[in-house]
Amino acid sequence: MTFSKIKDAINDFKKGKFGIVIDDKHRENEADLVLAAEKCSPEKINFMIKNARGLVCVPMLGKRLDELKLRLMAKINTEFTKCAFTISVDAKKGTKTGISAYDRAKTIKALIDRNTKPSDLAKPGHIFPLRYNKKGLSKRAGHTEAAIELCRLAKLYPAAVICEIIGENGKMAKMKELKRFAKKWGVRIIKIQELIR
């Protein structure tokens, strides 16, 4: 079976395991490797960078982004899926250049730390927060909203780490390659549409 049951994916997510989330074939038709932000570590971020190969982003609720004064990157969003990137950041404390897996994990942890203030973040940086659509998956069936929904269902802090899965040929990984990836690393695959039901 290609796709896993949502409850099994949630149990894995709760334990700090990765999941693969695929959106609709008529949308981006792409897969992201997803992890709960509170479960991230330098080793897990390094795994994403090395094996998923996409851009490491952090879906977050608007309330927290407002607390950190992280405005949207573009005033007028012309990207076709309306992915809501904020200005990128690095944690100032405990990091060097911000790009290493260690530094990126440190920044992600800082974003979800209630004690982090706007002044604790350098801008621009190497981590890209994404603003969750407050109407959720019913309004925007994207990886950002799906990742936050997984956090909620797993009763974890509502922030995640996502990274697109790019194939060895440099193009977006499709189902055949995703199956191999999932089997090799023991990761479950779910469809966003299953989270909406």
Feature names for model-found ranges:
Residues 1-197:
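Catalytic domains of riboflavin
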